[in-house]
């Protein structure tokens, strides 16, 4: 499993009049600075964690890969990836002086923005995961804006814990295309894993035993070794064959 990268797209936000960082899918960022963390979500989810006592916070942005397993199965690959994305954020905040028992969470995203996804709603899957994970970790959710059909623009102030969300129109240039690409990549990886499992299964199957060749006895042969289709020179049977061929 590759490391979750730290967001590096820093800029100055004129609206909030402070430095900012834009997060892309599968990135995270933590800080104690008075700045704004910004991201745009479709079916992906973002968890914003804040320690009000230490004045630090952070955000992640991720989508669970669809590995074909039960979404609630703790051992599935998608659940392991989601847990990893959350653990990276939590551990980085703890390293910076935060305390897990003081963390408060605000969660966003999980919209149904990908048309044609009839077998599973990726947004619902992501929203369900982040709720259950935080409940298991006993991190209180103080605000949420999850699911629905609209993409969202989220702004989070990690120093104060303040979060704002703006619903976007259904078709936002770049958002649907980006998440469709993520879904296609997840499907490709899933298909590759399935092929690898089939090949591994085939390689492990024991080879079928070869049937024993029937022994053929020679009629009237002396001092000969039985063999399939072999005729001993000088045997009566060989002589009979010669006479039939001459006739």
Swiss-Prot record:
Keyword Transit peptide among UniProt keywords: no
Any Pfam family the entry gives: CheD
Catalysed reactions listed for this entry: L-glutaminyl-[protein] + H2O = L-glutamyl-[protein] + NH4(+)
Record carries keyword Hydrolase: yes
Matches recorded under InterPro entries: CheD-like_sf, Chemorcpt_Glu_NH3ase_CheD, Cytotoxic_necrot_fac-like_cat
Entry EC number(s): 3.5.1.44
SUPFAM superfamilies listed in its UniProt record: CNF1/YfiH-like putative cysteine hydrolases
Enzyme class: hydrolase
GO molecular function terms noted in the UniProt entry: protein-glutamine glutaminase activity
Cystine crosslinks: none
Keywords for this protein: Chemotaxis, Hydrolase
Region (Disordered) residue spans: 204-247
GO annotation, biological process: chemotaxis
Alphabetical list of HAMAP family matching this protein: CheD
Sequence similarity: Belongs to the CheD family.
Function description: Probably deamidates glutamine residues to glutamate on methyl-accepting chemotaxis receptors (MCPs), playing an important role in chemotaxis.
Protein known as: Probable chemoreceptor glutamine deamidase CheD
Species per Swiss-Prot/TrEMBL record: Burkholderia orbicola (strain MC0-3)
Taxonomic lineage: Bacteria, Pseudomonadati, Pseudomonadota, Betaproteobacteria, Burkholderiales
């Amino acid at each position: 499993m590759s490391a979750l990268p730290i967001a590096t797209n820093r800029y100055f936000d004129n609206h909030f009049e402070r430095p900012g960082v834009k997060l892309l899918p599968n990135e995270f960022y933590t800080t104690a600075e008075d700045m704004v963390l910004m991201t745009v979500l479709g079916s992906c989810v973002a968890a914003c964690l804040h320690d009000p006592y230490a004045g630090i916070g952070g955000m992640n942005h991720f989508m669970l890969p669809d590995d074909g397993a039960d979404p609630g199965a703790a051992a599935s690959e998608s659940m392991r990836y989601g847990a990893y994305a959350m653990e990276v954020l939590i551990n980085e905040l703890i390293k910076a002086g935060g305390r897990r028992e003081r963390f408060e969470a605000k969660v966003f995203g999980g919209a149904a923005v990908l048309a044609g996804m009839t077998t599973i709603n990726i947004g619902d899957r992501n929203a369900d995961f982040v709720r259950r994970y935080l409940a298991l970790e006993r991190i209180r959710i103080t605000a949420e804006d999850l699911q629905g059909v609209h993409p969202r623009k989220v702004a989070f102030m990690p120093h104060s814990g303040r979060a704002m969300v703006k619903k976007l129109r259904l078709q936002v240039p770049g958002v649907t295309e980006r998440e469709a690409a993520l879904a296609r990549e997840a499907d490709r990886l899933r298909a590759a894993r399935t092929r690898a499992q089939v090949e591994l299964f085939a390689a492990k199957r024991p080879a079928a035993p070869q049937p024993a060749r029937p022994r053929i006895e020679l009629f009237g042969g002396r001092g000969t070794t039985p063999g399939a289709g072999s005729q001993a020179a000088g045997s009566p049977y060989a002589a009979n064959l010669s006479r039939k061929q001459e006739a």
